[in-house]
């Protein structure tokens, strides 16, 4: 559970850390968007090289990102299996009832796995190098035009900030409950999938109670400090673009242009 990196910020002084959070968020959104249009090995190789370069620029060990992939391994595997057995095409390599393994299915499964991993790694770069409050402030700034149509942008960014802070707290709380139950003889790693699923059920009630208690404590703390309206909040750190952000946007534009060129000319 402690390997889940969503919502965890690792302080640092790398080039990526110093970027404006809006730059990192825009870059992540653009990367995810272009990855959904990737149709060749060349575009996946180019995207993988871009992600590896971004990780190197964070000056953080790659093991940190690899550990972040482990908790969602089964989700990736499930998605890959669906693509492998349910993608139509020819030739058929294996046929067992309604399940078919085809060459297009294998290729599509590999593409989906690579796409999944690269998108998660890029999203992890954003969360590991940007504090949750900065992510929320960046989102509020980017969505500011929606205020004209009465979208509660400030409240949405506040909710995102709180949610991102709660994710690692809930994971740590889950690990504590699991350790306490293991000390009483409970096993979470033995038996089949059904037995393991049943072993997780006793975790839910104390975890749910703990989450409610943390939410109540947070609400009381905000009320004591006089918090009333998110729209009236001031910012301790004002967001501003710098020379690093201009360089990042140039690099991002270059990546996108090359990606489109590869995707268009290499199939």
UniProtKB/Swiss-Prot annotation:
Transmembrane segments: 26-46, 72-92, 101-121, 151-171, 247-267
GO molecular function annotation: transmembrane transporter activity
Keyword Transmembrane helix: yes
Membrane protein topology class: Multi-pass membrane protein
Keywords: Cell membrane, Membrane, Transmembrane, Transmembrane helix, Transport
Sequence ranges on the Cytoplasmic membrane side: 1-25, 93-100, 172-246
Ranges in the topological domain labelled Extracellular: 47-71, 122-150
Domain of life: Bacteria
Main location: membrane
Annotated localization: Cell membrane
GO CC term (a single one): plasma membrane
Quaternary structure note: Forms a stable energy-coupling factor (ECF) transporter complex probably composed of 2 membrane-embedded substrate-binding proteins (S component), 2 ATP-binding proteins (A component) and 2 transmembrane proteins (T component). This complex interacts with a number of substrate-specific components, including FolT, PanT and RibU for 5-formyltetrahydrofolate, pantothenate and riboflavin respectively. May be able to interact with more than 1 S component at a time.
Protein's job: Part of a common energy-coupling factor (ECF) ABC-transporter complex. Unlike classic ABC transporters this ECF transporter provides the energy necessary to transport a number of different substrates including 5-formyltetrahydrofolate, pantothenate and riboflavin. Upon expression of the complex plus FolT in E.coli allows 5-formyltetrahydrofolate uptake; 5-formyltetrahydrofolate is not taken up in the absence of FolT or the EcfA1A2T complex.
Protein family per UniProt: Belongs to the energy-coupling factor EcfT family.
Name listed for the protein in its UniProt record: Energy-coupling factor transporter transmembrane protein EcfT
Higher taxonomy: Bacteria, Bacillati, Bacillota, Bacilli, Lactobacillales
Gene that encodes the chain: ecfT
């Amino acid at each position: 559970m402690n390997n889940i990196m969503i919502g965890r910020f690792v302080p640092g002084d790398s080039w990526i850390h110093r970027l404006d959070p809006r730059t990192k968020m825009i870059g992540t959104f653009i990367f995810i968007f272009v990855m959904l249009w990737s149709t060749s090995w060349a575009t996946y190789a180019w995207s993988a090289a871009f992600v590896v370069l971004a990780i190197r620029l964070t000056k953080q060990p790659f093991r940190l990102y690899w550990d972040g992939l482990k908790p969602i391994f089964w989700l990736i595997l499930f998605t890959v299996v669906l693509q492998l057995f349910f993608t139509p095409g020819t030739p058929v390599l294996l046929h067992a009832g309604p399940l078919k393994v085809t060459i297009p299915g294998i290729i599509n499964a590999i593409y989906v796995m690579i796409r999944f991993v690269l998108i998660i790694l890029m999203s992890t770069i954003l969360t590991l190098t940007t504090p949750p409050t900065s992510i929320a402030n960046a989102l509020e700034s980017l969505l500011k035009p929606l205020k004209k149509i009465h979208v509660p942008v400030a409240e949405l960014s506040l909710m995102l900030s709180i949610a991102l802070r709660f994710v690692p707290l809930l994971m740590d709380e889950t690990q504590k409950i699991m350790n306490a139950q293991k000390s009483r003889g409970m096993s979470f790693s033995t038996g089949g999938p059904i037995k393991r699923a049943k072993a997780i059920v006793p975790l839910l009630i104390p975890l749910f109670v703990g989450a409610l208690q943390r939410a109540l404590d947070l609400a009381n703390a905000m009320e004591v400090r006089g918090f009333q309206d998110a729209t009236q909040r001031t910012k301790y750190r004002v967001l501003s673009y710098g020379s690093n952000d201009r360089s990042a946007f140039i690099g991002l534009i270059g990546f996108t242009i090359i990606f489109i060129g590869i995707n268009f000319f290499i199939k």
